[in-house]
């Protein structure tokens, strides 16, 4: 489909009106009547078509308006990329080039294996360091897009003789892709509105904290590249719907394939695009463009997504993919009915329509029920089901609810991660709904669904951030265009609709009255009152102040909240000097250097990836959490007393036990604060042995002091955390054994171990490692050793001076001779 070109008079008036309108001109001229800033040519010229602009010669260069606009757009995008990349380097500057958090350590370890052994070995890699004694087949249980991307960049750089360590590639991958995300957001917003809004959206998403939180340097996680793939897929989908081109649809399928390989959030795409098509059908906006775009996307995208080993046959056998299949069948039926509509009478078509829709709906409904009942279609997984029923995971699957990223989002988090964009985002949504068309239906659905999911789960704030940046950019763009534009030449933007096209073909009715004026023509020709220069200046300054405050807030949040690696902690003194707490790496290095290569370490699943990545030791559970029963067994060991836990540890061949304790430095993320989740997960698998109520006081409190539950004070986790802590007095104002994290004096200070021994405690007591003793060769007797209370009358004094004198046995029993009973007493 050829896009209409804008007249030359439009470029001239836009450039003369204001600098912001000049920036908008390229977007308006590119998209014709799709963009809100575009004007109708016949209207501007009083119904007479203006002359076509003369083609620019090769010597035009930057003398043409489009040349300056292209240069300005390129400069703004480059600066946005540079600002986004630079703001993500706080962690590298303050600490060093290091992998952050927990999951990135497994991704780095997998990427290192891929770069060292090749792609084929990576797909067939069996990791014996994880989930002892089960192990893990890595190639079929990961989304390999992140590893392949980093490995490919590393291979290209080394091919060009640029020697770079694979760790540095992993550290700086997410900041690099943030620039690509800015470009893809610019392209998508330009398709939805105009070029000025696209440039604002690119600047917003480059520095917004909601996206920076998962893309700082060192955060080598799937989301670092997945948001770029998400935005680029949406851009290509909008392009496909607007043009109906198979080429753009195939590009969309390839981008979707990359998204599937990178992140499990691809399910959001495969449900949002069918929802878009379904709503277009309900709004009677069906067209051949929509049919070509979705039919091609579903078939090719389905086949490509099934090539990922971890995905496999899920697109045709899981409930979260069934909506796409249903919309595909509905679209084919709708297209077939449109075909019959042109060949049947109205009465025949209505009868066939109701009969066909009823039969098709009944057949689909019965088929889904049958396939679900027989087990061919798997039900919703726990993570997806918890999006609809927010209390489901906490009751039935506590392992999902125990993850901090799966908690509901607080109201403060929205402002903290989005700042002023929260307020301007609804305004941009209203502008899109007011000037609705096919692609703006998509962004409206995107916004509504993303807001819901972000409210349910804090992790999904990441999917809300791009659409908030886009719609806020549209709102700011309209304000700037309104207050920086020329009052005499401002007109309402036309909206592409089927009713407008009908009015153009039928400008008047034969039976209209002579003095009758059509309503919509009157509204279009209605002029607005001019705005004074003072009002324009005040509003513009206020908008610029808001944007400056937004930039300052983003920089502050990035620096203070999202640029601290969890592996290295830092604290500040009263004079501003900084203390580095490197207990984690200290403990992992001790494990690497002082334990056997095949030693097995038991810890809570949060630290499994870090132990395998930094200490290179075998773990029982890790952050993959694919086996709930195995995690529950570890939780049972932590929640039981020492004797019961020792039996579990012996059955799992555990050599060392690692716990995190923050009572000395006030670290709130330690294992005592996570302990109730261990109890809940263990109770789900072993309800007869572990009960959560046993760890609370009769008043229902979780306390670590003397008033705490006896079950809690004698469990293995409590004893390992507070061993020898009762002897430590941290401050002259507090008693010995005072826990700074829970602000309480511990209740059990006399802790002794029978089956464990302390092997290592880090400098600040943050990481504590215990060695599991081997079983005794001979069982100890149950009875106590003999104790006598009979002592000699005289204190022993050694008089042995020569060998001839007899010796003396110390503590020898003294027997008293009995007396004969006299006959008189009898």
Swiss-Prot record:
This is Dolichyl-diphosphooligosaccharide--protein glycosyltransferase subunit STT3B. It catalyses: a di-trans,poly-cis-dolichyl diphosphooligosaccharide + L-asparaginyl-[protein] = N(4)-(oligosaccharide-(1->4)-N-acetyl-beta-D-glucosaminyl-(1->4)-N-acetyl-beta-D-glucosaminyl)-L-asparaginyl-[protein] + a di-trans,poly-cis-dolichyl diphosphate + H(+). It comes from Canis lupus familiaris (Dog). The modification N-acetylalanine is found at residue 2. Glycans are attached at residues 616, 623, 627, 641. It is an enzyme of class 2 (transferase). Component of the oligosaccharyltransferase (OST) complex. There are 2 OST complexes, OST-A and OST-B, which contain STT3A or STT3B as catalytic subunit, respectively. OST-A and OST-B contain common core subunits RPN1, RPN2, OST48, OST4, DAD1 and TMEM258, and OST-B contains either MAGT1 or TUSC3 as specific accessory subunit. The gene is STT3B. Pathway: Protein modification; protein glycosylation. A motif (WWDYG motif) lies at residues 604-608. InterPro entries: Oligo_trans_STT3, STT3-PglB_core, STT3_N.
